[in-house]
Amino acid sequence: MEQGEFEVLLEVGQAYLLKKDYEKAITKFSEALRINPHDPETYYYLGLAYEGAERYSEAAQTYEKTLKIDQGHGNAEIRLNEVNKKITEGGKSKK
């Protein structure tokens, strides 16, 4: 049952992420990580949600966790570099 619940939480979180409802996405991804705290993709999606919510420090920490679990996660490395630039620039970077 937990694996099924994990997958549902992940899918719902992704749907919120696509709708740019970042706070709800953060909640769902966090719940999924309580079930499976070793999934790099969930950390990556959580990082995207934090980044979308302009919570850059939390996004950076989450991308670092992704890379700690999966050192070859290229997307997390790219996003981490982008978030670190935003932090350095005071979070005022515009796309």
Regions inferred by a protein language model and the residue ranges of each:
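Register position in tetratricopeptide repeats
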Residues: 18, 52, 82-89
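Conserved structural position within tetratricopeptide repeats
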Residues: 31-34, 67-68
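Helix-start (N-cap) detector for alpha-helical repeat units in TPR-like alpha-solenoids
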Residues: 6-7, 40-41, 74-75
